[in-house]
């Protein structure tokens, strides 16, 4: 067995798979260390990928030739574009997935990735020398050497499951936790915290009264996540929707003292935007009902995931709750819901590359950084894997900022502000939403990926052809123009100012769509429908994008003012409070400093002025020595 690698990735979940594949795509010899290969790509919680904000992350992972989008397309059994009635900037692609198909597709891609080996073992300790990681020790005593290590342990770090009054160590139901690595982190001086998440009971779909619930079909035709997926081929299913009732709430109120969250058994924070059903009833007791989505877990699997009733109440209470919900009164519970507590590292311990500040060569991704969700984990895994491979080869680093994509927004939020509860991605977290759309993720990021070397030949060829087609289509649409009087003959009412307007400009008008401009200029019919859709969106946002481009330029100027070597004691005019916050956080740039809690605009102005003054004092060429 090989005992030395460029990169070792610990954990075979969504972060680990992306990290291992990304490192291997850059040519790094990579080991994916996991308890059992059979659990690689497992969907531990809900059987779905994407959603609002999250779908953007999946598209961005795909744009950098990651796995999740293609795997979701191969495993997807219902596709929906959320927020379809709203603008493209806040739409979110989402898919229900067949758990078995999803895991099988992920495992097949992992096995087919050159330079990537799978090691079935438990990682027990980190090996270090002179402030740098050198490898890992397995539970059986074997040692594996590496130039960089990525840890993606999910909920396994000292995982503790809670079900009613009972609790036991586990990383997932029926799977052992990782205890040794938590001790390694503590020995190395990392600040560890505890978080919790939960999952609902699983139901036998054959015992659900589907006639008593509302049915929700997917989109037709289904829209894939990956630009490389030509067509979704799986049969598509419907989901069900039901609601809790006042009787449900009465059962929960009568038993809430038996919930580990309210008995004092669980002290850690859970996800605010995905609360347990008992938390919903306590916090929103005035509502007459809460929605529950009944999500089938597979095409040949009767298991149904009731999204919306995550709980850790005792098993018999869970059965009593189900008996009060329309359509579920006679359902069979296959497995009770439960809560799980686990260790996480304060993400402010990390650089924007996801490398640990206190230990060179160690990268962290996923729930260990305080996030929740498959998509958040996958995006972090990809960034950590790329940087681990770059470090191992001596090839620099890649950091995505808030203007690059949602993955940059998420990582900046984590490493700058830290977390007090599990972090979830939303479109509202991004300042540059009009630029960072799910539909243009490849236009924003694939070029960077090609330059970096992490994008394969198939995607490179596809991207090059697409960008050329887009440029050609835009040039044609901008070259075709009419006067207001000519437009009136086609039923368009424009200002009678004598100004000619191009087809591209007309698409920005609310009453003008592609069909209308195509009717005026039949030559536009030659443009491929997918390219026409991109062009229509670009035209709609064109005037706003010009304004946002100016905002991004200002942001990038602040990001270009580096603070990495500054001595804050030498900066005149800074308050002691500002000095203390800056010393503790050690932000990399003035832009990042501005996103720290409690730092005033005045302090930022002092910093920026000091840096510019300092740069003017330095003689030319001083940076080179």
Swiss-Prot record:
Q: Which GO terms describe its molecular function?
A: flavin adenine dinucleotide binding
The GO biological-process annotations, alphabetized, read as: tRNA methylation; tRNA wobble uridine modification
Q: Which InterPro entries match?
A: FAD/NAD-bd_sf, GIDA_C_N, MnmG, MnmG-rel, MnmG-rel_CS, MnmG_C, MnmG_C_subdom, MnmG_C_subdom_sf
The record, for SUPFAM superfamilies, names: FAD/NAD(P)-binding domain (SSF51905)
Question: Where, in this chain's numbering, is FAD bound?
Answer: 11-16
Which annotated residues bind NAD(+)? 270-284
Q: What does this protein do?
A: NAD-binding protein involved in the addition of a carboxymethylaminomethyl (cmnm) group at the wobble position (U34) of certain tRNAs, forming tRNA-cmnm(5)s(2)U34.
Cross-referenced PANTHER family, in alphabetical order?
A: GLUCOSE INHIBITED DIVISION PROTEIN A, PROTEIN MTO1 HOMOLOG, MITOCHONDRIAL
Q: What is this protein called?
A: tRNA uridine 5-carboxymethylaminomethyl modification enzyme MnmG
| Annotated gene | mnmG
């Amino acid at each position: 067995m090989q005992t030395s690698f460029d990169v070792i990735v610990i954990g075979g979940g969504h972060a680990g798979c992306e990290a291992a594949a990304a490192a291997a795509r850059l040519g790094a010899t990579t080991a994916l260390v996991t308890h059992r290969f059979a659990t690689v790509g497992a969907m531990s919680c809900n059987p779905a990928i994407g959603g609002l904000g999250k779908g953007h992350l999946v598209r961005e992972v795909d744009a950098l030739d990651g796995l999740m989008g293609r795997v979701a397309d191969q495993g997807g059994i219902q596709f929906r574009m959320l927020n379809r009635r709203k603008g493209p900037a806040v739409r979110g692609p989402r898919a229900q997935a067949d758990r078995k198909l999803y895991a099988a597709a992920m495992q097949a891609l992992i096995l087919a990735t050159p330079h990537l080996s799978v090691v079935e073992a438990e990682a027990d300790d980190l090996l270090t020398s002179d402030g740098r990681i050198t490898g890992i020790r397995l539970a059986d005593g074997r040692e594996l050497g590496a130039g960089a290590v990525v840890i993606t342990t999910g909920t396994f770090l000292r995982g503790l499951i809670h079900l009613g009054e009972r609790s036991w160590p586990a990383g997932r139901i029926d799977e052992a936790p990782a205890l040794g690595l938590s001790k390694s982190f503590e020995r190395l001086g990392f600040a560890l915290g505890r978080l919790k998440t939960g999952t609902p009971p699983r139901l036998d779909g054959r015992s659900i009264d589907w006639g008593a619930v509302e049915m929700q079909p997917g989109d037709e035709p289904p829209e894939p996540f990956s630009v490389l997926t030509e067509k979704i081929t799986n049969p598509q299913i419907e989901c069900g929707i039901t609601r809790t009732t006042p009787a449900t709430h009465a059962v929960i109120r009568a038993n809430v003292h038996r919930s580990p969250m309210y008995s004092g058994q669980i002290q850690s924070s859970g996800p605010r935007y995905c609360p347990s059903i008992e938390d919903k009833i306590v916090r929103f007791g005035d509502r007459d009902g809460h929605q529950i989505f009944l999500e089938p877990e597979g095409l040949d699997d009767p298991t149904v995931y009731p999204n919306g009733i995550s709980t850790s109440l005792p098993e018999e209470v869970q059965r009593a709750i189900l008996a009060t919900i329309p359509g579920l009164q006679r359902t069979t519970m296959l497995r009770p819901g439960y809560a799980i507590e686990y260790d996480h590292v304060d993400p402010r311990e990390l650089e924007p590359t996801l490398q640990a500040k206190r230990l060179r060569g160690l990268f962290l991704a996923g729930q260990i950084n305080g996030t929740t969700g498959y998509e958040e984990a996958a995006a972090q895994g990809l960034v950590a894997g790329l940087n681990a491979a770059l470090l191992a080869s001596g090839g620099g680093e890649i950091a995505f900022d808030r203007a690059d994509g949602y993955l940059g927004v998420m990582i900046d939020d984590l490493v700058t502000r830290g977390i007090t509860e599990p972090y979830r991605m939303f479109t509202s977290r991004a300042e540059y939403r009009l630029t960072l759309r799910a539909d243009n993720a490849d236009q924003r990021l694939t070029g960077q990926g090609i330059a970096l070397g992490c994008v394969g030949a198939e995607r490179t060829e596809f991207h090059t052809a697409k960008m050329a087609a887009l440029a050609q289509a835009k040039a044609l649409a901008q070259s075709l123009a009419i006067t207001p009087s000519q437009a009136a003959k086609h039923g368009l009412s424009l200002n009678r100012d004598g100004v000619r307007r191009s087809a591209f400009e007309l698409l920005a008008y609310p009453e003008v769509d592609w069909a209308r401009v195509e009717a005026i200029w039949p030559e536009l019919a030659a443009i491929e429908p997918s390219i026409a859709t991109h062009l229509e969106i670009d035209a709609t946002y064109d005037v706003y994008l010009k304004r946002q481009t100016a905002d991004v330029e200002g942001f990038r100027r602040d990001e270009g003012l580096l603070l990495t070597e500054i001595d804050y004691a030498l900066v005149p005019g800074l308050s002691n409070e500002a000095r203390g916050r800056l010393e503790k956080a050690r932000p990399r740039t003035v832009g990042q400093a501005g996103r720290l809690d409690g730092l005033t605009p005045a302090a930022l102005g002092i910093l920026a002025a000091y840096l510019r003054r300092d740069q003017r004092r330095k003689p030319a060429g001083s940076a080179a020595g």
